[in-house]
Amino acid sequence: MLRAEVLTGLPPDRILHDLNQLAINDLDQSHRFVTLFYSDYDPRTKKLRFANAAHNPPLLWKSSDQKIVKLDAEGFVLGLQKDAEYNCSEIKLNENDLVLYYTDGVIDTSNSLGERFDEERLIKTFIKLCKQSYTSQEILNKIFKKLDDFTGQNRHLEDDASMVVFQLK
């Protein structure tokens, strides 16, 4: 479904709207839903367009400002509300900006004391790594290492912990 929608070239909010209509039919009576953050990047304009269906907002490291911006746009989960609306936002990216996309399994991971890794800890880790000018792959490796260190040897994930780092060169 997603691939077919992406190939239409529609803006992110329209893609989420169409996916929601399809999900309502597929998930009807299942009491399930989907969260999704969708973005597309235009290398000519250096603009990242995005829409959000109640997913964790990615973290944008603005290299020039040395600060984090949460990429969020209003939107309801997919598959529950037929008339759900989604907003499309866009932001211009600059050289050395990085975007961290992540699932809730990353911030919901807990240690032996029951403490969650949480978004604040992820943001602090991401800022520290960005300031040290690591590559996107090094950042991923170091965040996963931090998660492993945090959870200890008895790591048990309740949910997937997935991440992608997009770096503009």
Task: Locate predicted features.
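A residue-level signal for conserved active-site and pocket-lining positions in enzyme catalytic cores
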Residues: L78, D160
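Catalytic core of PPM/PP2C metal-dependent serine/threonine phosphatase domains
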Residues: M1-Q66, D72, Y86, T151-E158, ...
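Active-site-proximal, acidic helix/loop segment immediately C-terminal to a metal-coordinating Asp/Glu
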Residues: M1-G9, V69, L93, D97-N154, ...
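Short gly/ser/thr-rich secondary-structure transition/capping motifs
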Residues: H31-R32, L80-E85, K145
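Active-site metal-binding loops of divalent metal-dependent hydrolases
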Residues: N56, G105, A161
